[in-house]
Amino acid sequence: MCGIFGFILSKPLSMKEVFAVLKKLEVSKYPDEEFPVGGYGAGIAIMFADGDVRIEKVGKTADSPAGELEEIVKNASIMNAGLSNAKVLLGHVRNPSPGNMGTAKFKEAAQPFVGHFEQQLTVVSVHNGTVENWKDLRADLKEHVFESEKAGSFIDSEVIPHYFGEILLEQEDVDGAAYELLDTLEGSNAAALLQIDEENAFLHLIYKGKPRGLTVWANNKGEVIFCSRPEPVEKELESLLLSRKFKEKISISHQEDAGLKLTFRVPT
């Protein structure tokens, strides 16, 4: 299992604050859990105002992967000031299943994953859980190229943006497409997906089974924050939650079996 974090904000959040959350999230471990949420890779996807997306990620490192990624992004921001903060972001910390532990050192096996499609459609996702029917879904995506295969082992999470993109090409109903994805995925899964095309952008949150929890905060300004665990956000972004009057919209505990689909429009 892994951990996911992200947001849609009207004012940018600094990368220092982003990585403060991710570093807390990757070591999060409740007393009844055997392993922490992360520690074997980390990644972020930043969506810019023009709809372009920049992804940065690392595999397992000697110390904190989120800390290592923070340094990479900090150095990159010297050349690109747009990487110093973000209004729309997906974040991920990785703890792979035993069968995929051999891929931990490869950044290609870390998330976010992305799929590019016709009609200038892009889907970016971060995922926590296990897609039990990934082989069946992978078989329906024969023409697709998958980044994780460069690490020598296909990562089940990568079917999600590719499969969702194909659903979107077949139907115009955004909500219906997200529900279809939720229904199709077998196993315990939590995912956040950015759907971006020429005219619109949406953030979808889906949750099914027991993938270790999800908390969502929202306010009346259309802003949203989500995280697998509430503590990293409440600790590191307390002033933001208070000043912008965020309220807890959804709270699913790490032991709870639940189903959820939320869709938010991303201002473009």
Residue ranges and their predicted role:
Residues 1-268:
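Conserved short alpha-helical segments that host acidic/polar catalytic motifs at enzyme active sites
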